[in-house]
Amino acid sequence: MPRNTALEKYRNIGICAHVDAGKTTTTERILFYTGLSHKIGEVHDGAATMDWMEQEQERGITITSAATTTFWSGMDQQFEKHRINIIDTPGHVDFTIEVERSLRVLDGAVVVFCGSSGVEPQSETVWRQANKYGVPRIVFVNKMDRSGADFERVCAQIKTRLKANVVPVQLNIGAEEDFKGVIDLIRMKAIMWNEEDMGLTYELVDIPADLQDRAEELRMEMIEAAAEASEELMEKYLEGGELSEDEIHQGLRARVLNNEIVLAFCGSAFKNKGVQAVLDGVVRYLPAPNQVPAIKCETEDGEPASRPSSDDAPFAALAFKLATDPFVGNLTFIRVYSGVLKSGDAVYNPVKGKKERVGRIVQMHANKRDEIKEVRAGDIAACIGLKDVTTGDTLCDQEDVVILEKMDFPEPVISVAVEPKSKADQEKMSIALGKLAAEDPSFRVKTDEESGQTIISGMGELHLDIIVDRMRREFKVEANVGNPQVAYRETIRSKVEQEAKFVRQSGGRGQYGHVFVRFEPLDEVDENGEAKVFKFVDEVVGGVVPKEYIGSVAKGIEEQLNNGVLAGYPMIGVKATLYDGSYHDVDSSEMAFKIAGSMALKEGAKKANACILEPIMKVEVVTPEDYLGDVMGDLNRRRGIIEGMDENPSGRVINALVPLAEMFGYATNVRSISQGRASFSMEFKKYAEVPNNIADEIIKSRNS
């Protein structure tokens, strides 16, 4: 079956931005103008087509990126029909993972900025991610009808803060309440959209006299930018000082595709102005799948390879998102890089080493779906029937195996305990958490061996709130959520010799075990460089403790280590040497010596200056210079030790060691100190002694 749309006419794009820049509204307008949705869904009514999870409609934010396919032939029907696959991405920092995944499979992006707020913290994160994957992009400065909106100021911020070479291709006519339309700097005409039909039609009129000079200045800058694309264009420009419309398009396109410039458009999606011009920009300036470099991959032997975007190449696709659908079960969203996949075909997953059959293939329009027979290079679609696929896996032809690069996912930074409210919820909870963890690699689930509790970890407090919320709504599981917990430990600080005697004689056979044990701090590490928990040494001479009982003494000490001596936390870093003792021919037994060993530790550890240890985290905070003092002051208040400072393009990097107990609520706190512009990551570094005043509180609360 031949292609319906030639590959050159495909555009796989993402719409990304900071929370509240208006990106979902922009996507809604795109669907309206391209004829897919007949009534525009407003976000503040909770009716937007792309926000299909209940939590999204309630909170008015986008959590998971929905994928949609639509067609566009231009504002003036000047193009052949182009197929645009759109992925709407979340802008909240707790969901950065969704943005990262989307950018990984896109060929181009439209980054939306708010006309009054300009470049906000999450826009810096999104921009960094787009740079990481080399995604060509155009900019839409939205909300030009908002008070304080200023198109040129936002363009200047993008230049200075994001270090991007911005080239405006439009200029706004009026702003705030007086925002009327835009000047097209290529055609040098003003575009006025018709308000009666929600901006479906427009008029081209002359540029207002007061804006003529500024429009001409910006046009010259734009033509210079286009001319730098090639020597021929530059020669022509230097000879005549002008380029034709086609040459301008050609030059701008070449430079956008090379990530040398970023074109800026403006408008107000909510007021139905400017979105169709952005769609024209997507078709004109963003790449088709076969106009980006061939996807890099590896063969099964780890040799570097690549796959061209072609139907004739062997099949290769990346599973970039999993979702559970109430009607069809598991949906696996894939981006096809090469070859053809028909429903019913078998695919090979080299990451898992498994072969699976694709049941059906559907094209998603937000959460509505159309069944299709096949997908080809460049397509984005969802497969039904794959059981063993996780995010980031490759699907390919078993005869021609390649592994597309793995996606890197960040380590979770916050954990809480969850427990089902009733016995009936217990089994449902583990199924629900398993499914949610398969969908979202930045969310982890584990069982705490000490407490037996289920611990969930994620990218932030909002992230975990939404997980608990989804358990309740989608899986009907009610759960209690605990406060974040810290895994403390205990140890000893000095050397001590301890005698312990366990004697029971009450008629018949008694019990007799008698030992002398030396306890001291153990400063040894294992082959992984981790501190050793326990070491037992046998120095018994002359059989005063018979060989068959020595293992029991060690066992008794080790079991008591798990229960601690101060607050019931496991002990680590203890060396025990058995050097003397005595036995009874009839009454001694393994049990008696085991109990004697455990008594020796219990008594000895108290004399050996036992103390409580806490996990210390290695914390890295990236912050703009303006907030450096506040961020460092806050880390000091959290008992942090600043180890050093670095610089990177996003600002200053602070490296510190901070107790985990002081890091709860930090994500929210650092966000408010830096107005959301600082970001942080942390990982476990070591255990260290807790200050006495805090240790006393811990012991008191554990023993009460």
UniProtKB/Swiss-Prot annotation:
Keyword annotations: Cytoplasm, Elongation factor, GTP-binding, Nucleotide-binding, Protein biosynthesis
CC terms in the record's Gene Ontology section: cytoplasm
Locations listed in the record: Cytoplasm
Family membership noted in the UniProt record: Belongs to the TRAFAC class translation factor GTPase superfamily. Classic translation factor GTPase family. EF-G/EF-2 subfamily.
NCBIfam families cross-referenced by the UniProt entry: EF-G, PRK12740.1-5, small_GTP
Function: Catalyzes the GTP-dependent ribosomal translocation step during translation elongation. During this step, the ribosome changes from the pre-translocational (PRE) to the post-translocational (POST) state as the newly formed A-site-bound peptidyl-tRNA and P-site-bound deacylated tRNA move to the P and E sites, respectively. Catalyzes the coordinated movement of the two tRNA molecules, the mRNA and conformational changes in the ribosome.
Protein name per Swiss-Prot or TrEMBL: Elongation factor G
Source species: Francisella tularensis subsp. holarctica (strain LVS)
